[in-house]
Structure formats: structure tokens, C-alpha cells
Amino acid sequence: MKVEKSSKGLEVLVRTQEDDLEGFSFLEIMDRVDPLPLDFENYKNFKEGIYYMCTHDGTKIGFVLKFAINEMETVCSEIFEETFQLDESRHELRFKSEDFDHRNNLIDQLARKMYLESSLSGVKGWRNEKYAVWVNKKPYVLVERAVAGVLGIITYGIHINGYVLDPKSKKVQFWVPRRSKTKQTWPLMLDNIIAGGLGYPYGIYETVLKESMEEANLEKSVIEDNIKATGSVSYLYFTGDISVTKFNKESDFIVGEVQYVYDLKLSEDIIPKPNDGEVESFNLFSLQETINALRKKEFKPNCALVMVDFLIRHGYITPENEPNYLELVTRMHRRLPFPTLN
């Protein structure tokens, strides 16, 4: 993709001959986040390797791999049996307790036991942050963030695209942070200016303000004066191939994700700065530099998707330069199979 100027002097993306020869599509970015077909639950290996985590009254709320169930039974058998009823015939893992606080206490004990004794690497990244599983718009159980993948729940976050638009040239530049080399996940990859998980009991906008100060050292007044809610993206994060995956390892986890998306238009004199050690640096990327980084897979996958969302909404990615435009836009808003926050 090459950035050129339109007859009105605006920046536009033009598809090149090289793009056509390589068959390039921004759909590749979607595939890195969610390659699952609509009928993924009908695949034989999915039916064999996946169990549904359910509420005490049978509402499905998560995907749990059989090997993860085996690990929990091995590491914390007593807590597991007190927490869940395992139905092998229906492939269901059902909470036993009808009480919110009791469920939270049990799942917290289970998570801590897994952290100390499990062989699963993901649970070692303890965050001391709870994610809520929502049913009927209310929190059903609170889960330590580090075991969200084990239980296959829907998680939520906020992602903000920060940009500067030159009033004369109309050229856009993006504030792009590079993740810290010490980050537990995706170290040194490119990110959105501000992003963070929706930890309980923080609200969505409350998280926007909290993360803005923590990650970019941006004051509340800057955010309130310049932020704009622009929608959401939703997907089932999965890195395998549904046709061959055996669902017998951590990289086979399926986690539903909802990202609430915001635009933050900043003036040239407002400069984000690393504040909490999670960001190495902030840099201004031109539109061409951003496109190049997307193509080179330098962005964290879901951050790349949020950037693509911006490029679609602002008219840079269009039906004229993206051969899979309709599929891309549709797949960025997957209808998730479990109850959601809103």
C-alpha cells in the first residue's frame, strides 16, 4: 500500500501492483487475531477437545480445553471438585455454587493453587487483577486475569488510537508506543497509544482515564477534551488452525475478547510519555510508516486490528483498495457465543 495525495490534497491509500501480485489484504491482520470460521463448533476436534464452562443453571460462559481440566484435577483436585460439576457426556464444566461470593472464593483458591503448582506457563503471569464474567449484565464470577485463558472466558479492554492531524497539510500521524521489553506478553511490539484490560470493578471510561495516566502520563483534562468513543471490535482470539488443532496445549486456548475503541486527537504540543514501565518509548508514525509496520507484523495482533478499525472509519481503507473489505468489516465484529457486559 502506498500513500499518495488525492486531487483535494488529502492522504489516500493506493493499492500497488506489488500488492496485487502478493495478494495482500488487511484480512491477514484479522486472521492473526481470529481465524475461526462461523461453524467452528461443528469441527470434530473441537467437539472432542473442548468443554463448555457453565453457570450453576446451565448458561455457557467459557471454552475449557480437556487438557486444562485434567491439569486442574491433578493440581487442585479438592478445590476443583468443590467448585465444578464435570459432565463428560455433555462436555460441560458447571459451577456448583449459587452464591456469588462463594464462587469467587473458590475460583480464587483454584487460581492461586494453579499459580503455585501448575505446569501451565500462562498462569505464572499473575496480575493480581480480576476479570468479571458477565451474565444478564451482572458479574457472575470474578476470575484472576492470569487464568482467563484456562477458563476461556470473554475478556474486555479499552484501546485508544492517538493521532495528530496537521490542519494545513491534512497529514495524519499516529502516536505509537513500543511495549517494554519486560512486559509479560508481546514485549517490544508496537501498541496503541493507550490500551488496558477492564479489571473489576472499574468501569469502561474509568479505565480509559486510569490507563491514560498510567501508560502515557496524560492528564484527565487532556483525555476529556479530546477523546471520542468510536465503537468496539469483538473476536475469538485463537492462534491455531481449527482443521488440525488437537486442543492439547496452551496455544490452543480460545478466548473471547471485546475491545472498546476510542480516538484521541491530540495537538502537536501534547506529547505522551512512559509512566509505569510498560512502554519503552512513544514515537510519531506517518501514515506510510504505520501501514508498513502493519504489513511487517510489528504491532501486537489486536492492536493492529484496532489500527485497521481506525483506518476503515477514517476512510483510508476502502472497498476500492481492500479486496476483502466486506468480510473484514464483518469479521471485526463477531457475535460472541456467551453473555457479554453490554
UniProtKB/Swiss-Prot annotation:
Q: Which InterPro entries match?
A: DUF4743, NUDIX_hydrolase-like_dom_sf, NUDIX_hydrolase_dom
Read off the Pfam families from this record. Answer: DUF4743
Residue intervals of the Nudix hydrolase domain? 155-309
> Which Gene Ontology molecular-function terms are recorded?
8-oxo-dGDP phosphatase activity
Spell out the note in the miscellaneous section.
Present with 217 molecules/cell in log phase SD medium.
Output this protein's name: Uncharacterized protein YJR142W
